[in-house]
Design a protein with these regions (language model features):
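Short acidic-glycine-tyrosine-enriched beta hairpin
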Residues: 49, 63-98
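A short, N-terminal "cap"/entry segment at the start of jelly-roll beta-barrel domains
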Residues: 1-26, 39-40, 75-76, 84, ...
Length: 125
């Protein structure tokens, strides 16, 4: 199966392609433009494996004391632990269900691309 075709989500900052043909897992590809970032979101009902394919950037991960559904750029409720990881091609990162994730492309010239692999139960269309 290939993650390609038309983007499922597209903004000026980033694009997301998703392959939902498999029965138990979802594979998606995200490309972030130079100097841009994802909006950030909280993972619901699924751990997610991120595989950095190209570029460099940072990943902000916040663990909550009380998880709630949500998207947004200011996850200020009930923060238990906050980490920031430098990303480069070849990195593999596991983010657990309930955590908030935001990815920033730190390059002025190159795109940042990564794959996400997660359980179908955690997919928000």
């Amino acid at each position: 199966y290939r993650v390609g075709g038309s983007p499922q989500k597209e903004t000026d900052d980033y694009s997301v392609w998703t392959n939902d043909l498999l029965n138990k897992i979802i594979a998606s590809k995200t490309i972030i433009q130079p100097g841009k970032a994802t909006i950030g979101h909280q993972l619901i009902n699924s751990d997610v494996v991120y595989v950095v394919v190209n570029g460099r950037g940072t990943m902000e991960v916040i663990e909550y004391m009380n998880s709630k559904e949500g998207h947004g750029s200011d996850p200020s409720r009930g923060i238990d632990h906050k980490d920031s990881y430098a990303l480069t091609a070849g990195d593999v990162i596991l983010v657990e269900s309930g955590d908030y994730v935001k990815v920033v492309n730190e390059s002025d010239h190159d795109q940042l691309a990564y794959l996400r692999i997660f359980d179908r139960e955690g997919w928000r269309k």
